[in-house]
Amino acid sequence: MDKLQYELQGYLEIDRYRKQRFLYPLLFREYIYALAHDHGLNSSIFYEPTENLGYDNDNKSSSLIVKRLITRLHQQNHLTISVNDSRFVGPNRSFYSQTIPEGFAGIMEIPFSVRLVSSLERERIAKYHNLRSIHSIFPFLEDKLSHLYYVSDILIPYPIHLEILLQTLRTRIRDAPSLHLLRCFLHEHHNWNSLITSTSNKSISIFSKENQRLFLFLYNSHVYECESVLVFLRKQSSHLRSISSLAFLERTHFYGKIKHLVVTPRNDSQRTLPLWFFKEPLMHYVRYQGKSIMASRCTNLLMKKWKYYLVNFWQCHFHLWSQPGRIHINELSNHSFYFLGYLLGVRLTPWVIRSQMLENSFMIDTAIKRFDTIVPIFPLIGSLVKAKFCNVSGYPISKSVWADSSDSDIIARFGWICRNLSHYHSGSSKKHSLCRIKYILRLSCARTLARKHKSTVRAICKRLGSKLLEEFLTEEHEIVSFIFRRTRLRSERIWYLDIIRIHGLVPHS
């Protein structure tokens, strides 16, 4: 990590430019685009391999071409749009529409990356790379939700206009030329309208693969500002003390976790503030992408007040119309909610305890709250239907588009999907739903092979034998079986710290 900081501070001269709050000259540094093409930073904890984001490493960066493109961009007149405008047609347009945003996003990420590294080192968090894992959220929920009463399911609204994003960035980036360049680029980008007006899909997948790095940075900045309502409420709520508050910024998917928010009693000089701020209880907040949850031990009335705060703050501060229906408040003991591909809830498990005192014995009926993580079988089957592995009834069908591949390739593809789904849903408290998904994939694989060889499923299974079955067994299943007994393995929740993204078949929106 010291090496990473040395690269950021020395190689990019970040200290000098950060003091001057002037980032625009960095766009004319050729090494910026080398770093944007996975020549330095992408090996750190903040980034994913560039092949996952569609970058073309064969595209050579030239500072002279970049300067020419920036000059042309500034000379364009956005009041008149011509269909025959060919100034950015062909290879130059491809270079312009991808390279400049890559460099701009890389420059904008530098201060956040340095700030995150210093924050983690200051907090002395060991193995903080494990915090990138999506599964790191669930132990937190497992430890806290079973003691809470109400949960609020929130969808963060999207910006309705690009100027809102630019105004948001202006509060943190005071470099006018850089913001002007960003505004020009956003006016040019043909996918921007679909980015900010899409209502059919609220997940982050609406971003185009082209320039995904820049759009993810803008989206993260927008969400970060939307969450600033928590800071606003902290100031309004007197001594609202944050025990642990860390923001994890990543280029792909990132989430902010505020572990505890505690309100302590106010002093006499603050009695003029509203009465209902006096005893606001513990509030927990977790977010992934555009969906977040807030849970608390407070009453339904206080949860409605938090909902009122959020809706009005977003509307007044960001001019975002957030429908109240996007924030659902439910009682945890009677409601389950979808989050990160799991159906989460709190279940009351009855227990009978026998107590004996001297010669008298007592039978005490009690109930223990248990945090449930269930694999949502119907949404998963719906994903399999869209991928054409089964029909709407869950009956396995052949994957016809894979029938031209070799037998080993077909088996490997199905096995890879099955292992990834099993790996991600290893934290499920009930594994029988996952067994059904495995059965659908295994039989779909057999039907695909049978279609290729114009044979029957029984003949294929008899010919391949154990080879077909072994491909669908996860490697960690064999390792974990040595730790837990077979009877406990079906009920034990196992969270892995190497999962940094959700599989495409997992319904998480």
Swiss-Prot record:
Entry keywords, A to Z: Chloroplast, mRNA processing, Plastid, RNA-binding, tRNA processing
Pfam families: Intron_maturas2, MatK_N
Cellular component aspect of the GO annotation: chloroplast
UniProt entry tagged with the keyword Transit peptide: no
GO biological process, one term: mRNA processing
Subcellular location: Plastid, Chloroplast
GO molecular function: RNA binding
HAMAP family cross-referenced by the UniProt entry: MatK (MF_01390)
Family of this protein: Belongs to the intron maturase 2 family. MatK subfamily.
Described purpose of this protein according to its UniProt entry: Usually encoded in the trnK tRNA gene intron. Probably assists in splicing its own and other chloroplast group II introns.
Protein's name in the database: Maturase K
Annotated source species: Nymphaea odorata (White water lily)
Lineage, highest ranks first: Eukaryota, Viridiplantae, Streptophyta, Embryophyta, Tracheophyta
